[in-house]
């Protein structure tokens, strides 16, 4: 002994080393027996995407290399320098990739789609790890989130052309679930969805919004005014229903009446203007002095005279006739 130090002989050193080894092995076996294998302990594969592509070499899997998710020069991409490649989205594959013995089941990784084993919340949280600003900012608490819609139900991350991201194909993706709205767009008068000139996200924010029906603007009218700016006003003579809400008179997805009206005039007008003696009351030929059909039943009915139905700036336009 020299000072406070202890000199250990060769035999003592070997004995202590053996005891340490036994302790490590015992702890490892104990951990295995208790099933202590949390996700954080699952190793990543040693060769990254090369390991995955040894099996997943079909066209759907390889298509990822033609998307923004696999751009080596973009540090934000899962395939950017130093990133985890396939495992950035699908999770650690160290337990999934090794060869399994006959009769054993290969441990799964994160799979995407509402019909997969992975919980939808886990799938979506994985997407939000990157898409956590902009479109993903209002996701939590949105109607799609509450209904457990998976990101992969609408988006195809491996597709070079994601259908929901393009105006001409987006409505068909939305209509897979929103079938009532699809039926309305097939009526005689509708917005130009099937002409590829308009998509659902022009009015609705699919990733969440504070407005009703997840509108992109706070009110129905402000949403409509994005395209129909000439109806905004302000007018000297306002038509109260038009200023209150466009959908009081119009069906936004489609209608069998011109102008996408909820019903034809004069019936639409009479839902408000029904007081006794008002000229908008529809008379048949028998109720008229001339015995001829009423002008209020022909053509645009009330709008033959009251043509400025959204409002008028004319000094004498109080009746919306000019």
What are these regions (language model features)?
Residues 1-13:
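N-terminal secretory signal peptides that target proteins for export/translocation
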Residues 16-28:
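Bacterial N-terminal signal peptides
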Residues 31-322:
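Short sequence/structural segments immediately N-terminal
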């Amino acid at each position: 002994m020299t000072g406070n130090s202890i000199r250990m002989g060769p035999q003592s050193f070997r004995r202590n080393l053996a005891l340490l080894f036994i302790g490590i092995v015992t702890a490892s076996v104990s951990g295995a027996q208790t099933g202590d294998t949390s996700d954080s302990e699952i190793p990543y594969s040693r060769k990254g995407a090369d390991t995955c592509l040894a099996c997943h070499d079909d066209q759907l899997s390889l298509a990822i290399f033609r998307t923004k998710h696999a751009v080596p020069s973009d540090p934000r991409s899962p395939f950017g320098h130093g990133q985890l490649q396939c495992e950035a989205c699908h999770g650690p594959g160290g337990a999934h990739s090794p060869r399994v013995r006959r009769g054993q089941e290969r441990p799964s990784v994160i799979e995407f789609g509402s019909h997969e084993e992975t919980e939808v919340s886990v799938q979506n949280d994985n997407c939000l790890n990157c898409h956590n600003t902009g479109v993903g900012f209002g996701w939590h608490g949105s109607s799609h989130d509450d209904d457990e819609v998976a990101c992969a139900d609408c988006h195809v991350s491996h597709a070079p052309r994601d259908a929901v991201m393009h105006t001409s194909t987006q409505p068909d993706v939305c209509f897979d679930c929103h079938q009532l709205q699809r039926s309305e767009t097939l009526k005689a008068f509708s917005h130009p969805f099937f002409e590829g000139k308009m998509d659902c996200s022009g009015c609705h924010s699919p990733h969440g919004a504070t407005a009703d029906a997840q509108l992109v603007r706070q009110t129905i009218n402000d949403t409509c005014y994005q395209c129909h700016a000439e109806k905004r006003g302000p007018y000297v003579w306002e038509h109260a229903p038009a200023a209150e809400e466009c959908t009081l008179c119009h069906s936004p997805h489609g209608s069998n009446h011109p102008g996408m009206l909820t019903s034809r005039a004069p019936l639409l007008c009479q839902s408000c203007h029904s007081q006794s003696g008002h000229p908008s009351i529809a008379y048949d030929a028998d109720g008229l002095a001339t015995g001829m059909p009423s002008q209020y039943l022909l053509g645009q009915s009330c709008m033959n005279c009251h043509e400025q139905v959204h409002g008028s700036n004319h000094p004498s336009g109080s009746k919306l006739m000019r």
